[in-house]
């Protein structure tokens, strides 16, 4: 599991619950010691420093398992590994290609499991309406809105998409 800075400092509960869901599904969740993806540095034009962070992060993530999916609940941090380091920082290393190809957003991964018939959908009914705004970081990755599709699998849940282009 790759929590990134967002999941370690700002959205801690999201990271914790993501790990709990994966463990509930029977996964052994490994959380290698890892640092920042360099997104903040990149956003401030410090490309050389950002590249160093990306290189270290890819080494850290590969150190635990070189075959397993890398699940993240941080769209920004996951997007850095999947797209931005390639497209903006112009990085093209074997390590980054490997890590980027194995990185999944948590909702994207769970929806993939559902599509493969591997997600237990024995959900309890809960009558609730949930407002949802797709993060820009996930929109930029072109993955659609897997969180809406997942929540819609729960009996009684109605999801109201904000349909706003940006928060």
Language model regions located:
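Iron-sulfur cluster-binding electron-transfer modules in prokaryotic oxidoreductases
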Residues: 2-167
């Amino acid at each position: 599991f790759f929590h990134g800075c967002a999941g370690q400092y700002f959205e801690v509960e999201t990271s914790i619950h993501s790990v709990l869901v994966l463990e509930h599904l029977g996964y052994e969740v490994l959380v290698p010691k890892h640092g920042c993806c360099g997104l903040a540095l990149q956003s401030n034009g410090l490309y050389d420093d950002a590249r160093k962070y990306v290189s270290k992060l890819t080494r850290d993530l590969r150190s635990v398992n070189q075959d397993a999916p890398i699940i993240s609940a941080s769209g920004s941090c996951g997007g850095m590994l999947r797209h931005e380091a390639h497209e903006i920082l112009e990085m093209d290393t074997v390590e980054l290609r490997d890590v980027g190809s194995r990185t999944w957003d948590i909702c994207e991964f769970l929806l993939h499991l559902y599509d493969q018939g591997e997600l237990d959908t024995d959900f309890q009914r809960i009558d609730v309406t949930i407002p949802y705004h797709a993060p820009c970081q996930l929109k930029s990755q072109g993955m659609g809105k897997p969180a809406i599709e997942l929540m819609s699998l729960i009996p009684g849940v109605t999801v109201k998409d904000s349909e706003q282009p940006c928060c």
